[in-house]
A protein has these predicted regions:
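Collagenous Gly-X-Y triple-helix signature in extracellular proteins
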Residues: 64-332
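Tryptophan-rich substrate-binding surfaces of secreted polymer-degrading and adhesive proteins
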Residues: 1-83
Length: 332
């Protein structure tokens, strides 16, 4: 049999083989201390010894346990709770994250971070996805990219329906703009989301994760020109027209990181370093972990930011709407 079954396709771990279950192509099961991968749809009562339907992982050029392409294997297991730095460090050591082995960690696996406020379940969205990206703060490849399993909280992007300068006096940038449109203080970076909500999330997580919550650089939109036509189409006006590198510990995802392409993003300045789809979204849809509406990082128009829709569609919403918050963080 040719040893090309796996290639670059994704494997989905299904645990121990069950005779009562049916399986789909690329499902992987454990059986008699071995790992087997389905070559086609497998009917019930078809054990992995049936080579018409199954192939042993080693025969398929899949090495176990540390040779997996972890960005191509989805599992979705509960890994427990972390409420202290000591627990996190024990977790990182147990799973050999620093060496890049990622032992017994797979896409969709999640852990509850007990930060005292958000207490969210964070799932593995990718392994080393942010490696070597940035201007000054550059993560290495031996890191976990995490996103909340569901909405961490709800918040507006801005206090008014604008993707321009925030009118919120609580926004730290207001002291410099006084609410007057100023290039470099608009779009995602100038928003209340980036300046108020994200820093609060970062502070709460840092109290538990310490320096293992990595500071990284994002190349995000900073200027919005209301007269520039948006690539969102349908006559929408208002687009991101400049960007800059900014150091963050948490940031909303781009459309590309979720969908694999832009939909409502107003211009190339909405993508930046977030130019590739997170591996987890090769296995689940944006509503695959529950129906919810949540913000994305892209400007859609002068009044709207991009979002992921409750019913499983790409969307955009008025900036003052309170919607779900699901930031991307990097831990290692």
């Amino acid at each position: 049999m040719a040893a090309t079954l796996v290639g670059k396709a994704g494997i989905v771990l299904k645990g121990a083989y069950s005779s009562a279950s049916t399986y789909e192509i690329m499902d992987a099961v454990s059986y008699n201390n071995g790992l087997y991968i389905a070559e086609q749809a497998v009917p019930a009562n078809t054990p992995p010894t049936n080579t018409t339907y199954w192939q042993a992982a080693l025969d398929a050029n899949v090495l176990i346990p540390n040779g997996y392409n972890h960005n191509g294997i989805y599992r979705g297991s509960n890994l427990g709770t972390i409420s202290s730095l000591a627990q996190l460090e024990a977790f990182l050591t147990e799973h050999e994250v620093a060496s890049g082995k990622f032992t017994n960690l797979y896409l969709g696996d999640y852990i509850k971070i007990q930060d005292g406020t958000y207490n969210g379940n964070w799932c593995i969205a990718g392994f080393g996805t942010e490696a070597n990206k940035g201007s000054a703060n550059i993560p290495n490849k031996n890191t976990l990219s995490l996103i909340p399993l569901g909405n961490l909280t709800s918040a507006p992007m801005n206090s008014t329906n604008t993707t321009g300068v925030s009118k919120n006096t609580d926004n730290p940038l207001y002291a410099e703009t006084q609410g007057v449109e100023t290039a470099g203080y608009q779009a995602y970076w100038g928003s209340d989301m980036a300046q108020i909500t994200m820093p609060d999330i970062e502070a709460k997580l840092t109290a538990v994760l310490g320096t293992h919550l990595k500071t990284r650089d994002i190349l995000c939109s900073m200027t919005m020109t209301p007269t520039t036509p948006s690539m969102a189409g349908a006559g929408a006006n208002g687009a991101s027209t400049n960007w800059g590198w900014k150091a963050v510990k948490a940031a909303l995802m781009t459309e590309v990181q979720v969908y694999g392409s832009t939909v409502y993003s107003s211009s190339n300045f909405d993508v930046g370093e977030g130019y590739e789809k997170l591996p987890i979204f090769n296995f689940i849809s944006p509503v695959g972990q529950g129906r919810a509406h949540w913000w994305l990082r892209a400007v859609a128009s002068s009044s709207h930011f991009a979002s992921a829709g409750y019913s499983g569609y790409a969307d955009a919403g008025g900036a003052s709407h309170s919607s779900g918050v699901r930031p991307l963080i990097v831990v290692g």
